[in-house]
C-alpha cells in the first residue's frame, strides 16, 4: 500500500511537467529539454522523500529516551548502540480527555513494566504455578526417596509434582470485585517415558482439581476489605518447605470462608468446609462414606514487636453420620469415628538483613495426633492416605517446629528445619492403638553465596523416632543424609526465590528401620545418588 501511494504521487507530479514539456518541445533545444527533465526529477525525489518521512512518523511509537548514564569514573556507560534493538524505557500513554479549562499535556510517561502490569490488570487474568522435575541415578539400581519428611528434600526426591492455577476477574465496579479461580495439581512420573494419567506402572501419574471457587471483595458490609469465598477451597496452607509437609492444612471438597478480615490489631481467617472420608472395617477391605465438616479459625498477623507477628489457630472436625453408618460401626466391624481437633500458635520473626524464622507449637488429639506420629509425611490429616481406620481413644500429641533462613555476612546463608514431637495413647499406623512416641528431626542447609546466581553448599539431615506399643515393646527408626549441591538461582534466598536448578550428590543411610522395614535396591540400607533437578514457581 505504501509503495502504491508513492508511485501514484510520482505520476501525478510528473503529469503537469510532461504536458509543459510537450507544449514547449518545438522551441527548446535538446540541452534545455534535458535540464528541465533533471530539475523535474530532483523535485519529484524531494516530494517522495517528504511523503516517505511522513509515513514513517505515523507508524513509529513515541518513546521517552533516557539520557546517557555515566559510571563512577565519569565514562559513559555503554554509549555505543548494539546490533539488537533496545527496549524503550517508557511509553507515552494518553490520559483521559481534559476539559477546555485544564492545562498540561494529555500524555504521561509509563515504564514498560508498569504498562505491562496495567494491561494484565485490565484483562483481569493471571496464570500461576509450580513444578519440579529432574534426573537422578543411584549406586545400585533405581534411586529411591526415603523419609523426606525427616531428612530433607535436596537429593532425596524423584517426583514431578505440579500446581497450576487460573484466575479470572469477572467483575470490578463500585468497590466490589469477583474472581473465578481454578487450580489443578498432581504428579508427572519421572521414571517411564510415557505418562498417561491413571494408566501407568505404579500409578505415578495423577491429577486433580484441588480448587474451584469464587472469591469476592466488598460484598460484606462488616468486612469490605476481606476475601469472601465459596466453592472447593480450604484455609491457607503453611509448609515446612525443607521437609515438604504442612503444619497447617485443611483439605476440602467444598466450603465457605473469609480471609484477611481486619479485626483489632490482626486479621481473621475462618473456613467451614466439607471433607468426607472412607471409614474402613477391621479387614481394611470394606468401606463406607462418612460426611465430615471442619471449622478452621485463625487470628494472624498480630504485631508483637518490630518485625515479629503472632498467629493463634484452632481446628475442629466432626462427623454427620447416618443411622446406617452408626449401625455398621456398632455391629459390622467398622471403625468408630472420633471427632478430632488441633490448636496452637506460631511466631514469625523477620531479620533486618533478610531472612526469617518461624516457630510453632501445636497440640492435637485422635486421628490428627496419629499423623503427628508419622516420620515420613506429617501433615495434620484426619486420615491415612485417604482411609479412616484405627482405635482412637482420645490420645494427644504435641509438636514444636522451627524453620527459616538467615544470612551470615555477605557470602553465607543457612536454612533450617527442626521438629520435636511426642504423643501419648495415640493410634499409630505402625504400632497400633495405645502407642506412645517421641521423635526429633533436624535439617540444616548452609551455603556459600558466589553471587546472585550461584550457591554451593551442603544439606545435612538426621532423625530418630521411637514408638512404644500397648505392650511396652519399643520400635526405633533413624537415619541420616548428606547432600553436596551447587545451584543456579535468580536470587540469594534459599526458601523464597525460584526458579532454581540444582546439581547434587547424596549419600543416605537408614540406621534403624523397625517401623517400616524400608530398604533400598538389593536390600541395601544405604544409597549414593547423583542428579540434577529444576524447581520453579511463577
UniProtKB/Swiss-Prot annotation:
Main location: membrane
Source superkingdom: Bacteria
InterPro entries in alphabetical order: G_neg_Bact_CarbUptk_Porin (IPR050286), LamB-type_porin_N_dom (IPR021570), Porin_LamB (IPR003192), Porin_LamB_sf (IPR036998)
Membrane topology term: Multi-pass membrane protein
Keywords: Cell outer membrane, Ion transport, Membrane, Porin, Signal, Transmembrane, Transmembrane beta strand, Transport
Pfam families: LamB (PF02264), Sugarporin_N (PF11471)
SUPFAM superfamilies listed in its UniProt record: Porins
Signal peptide: 1-25
GO biological process, one term: polysaccharide transport
A GO CC annotation given for this chain: pore complex
Subcellular location: Cell outer membrane
Entry's Gene Ontology molecular function annotations: carbohydrate transmembrane transporter activity; porin activity
Annotated family: Belongs to the porin LamB (TC 1.B.3) family.
Its job: May be a sugar porin with a broad carbohydrate specificity.
Protein name (Swiss-Prot/TrEMBL): Putative outer membrane porin BglH
Organism this protein belongs to: Escherichia coli O1:K1 / APEC
